[in-house]
Amino acid sequence: MLTPDSSVIKDSLCAVSRQLGFSGCRVARAEKSPHAEKLFQWLERGWHAGMEWMARSPERRTDPAEVLPGCRSVICLSYDYDSPGRRPEGEGSICLYAHGKDYHGILEEKLADLQELLSIYGGKQRGYVDSGPVMERDHAEACGLGWRGKSGCLLYTSDAADEARSVD
């Protein structure tokens, strides 16, 4: 059986991701988070407050191979929120992600389509939308989707335009 090389798979993945509406698609090696020690210290100090789930299996959060054994690559995608228009004068402002439908379900459906494509190539994968035990900002930065700002949010430049965006 002839299998395509990784660049063919990556090109196919990114082309399909654009068709699904993702604005960015990047791939990097699956490596342990450079901020692992900071996370462990943060947890030891009890700074996770009532988020007890953060303290369960912190190693899984910092190493993709702990989440998916044999993992070799991390795929990071960006998706621009729809902006239905400017808010009326005198009204309070609401974050863009809160204007429309809950993005978790929308993006999970799109990820399912991408996972189907990767399965054709024999890949095993896990997809998360702000819900998995992964340090997504570290992976997105390693993939080249953007850089970490002072706020800790990832600032990225859209593939479609040279405008900086903030995501968290």
Locations of regions flagged by a protein language model:
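Auxiliary alpha/beta "docking" domains used to position bulky ligands
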Residues: 1-159, 166
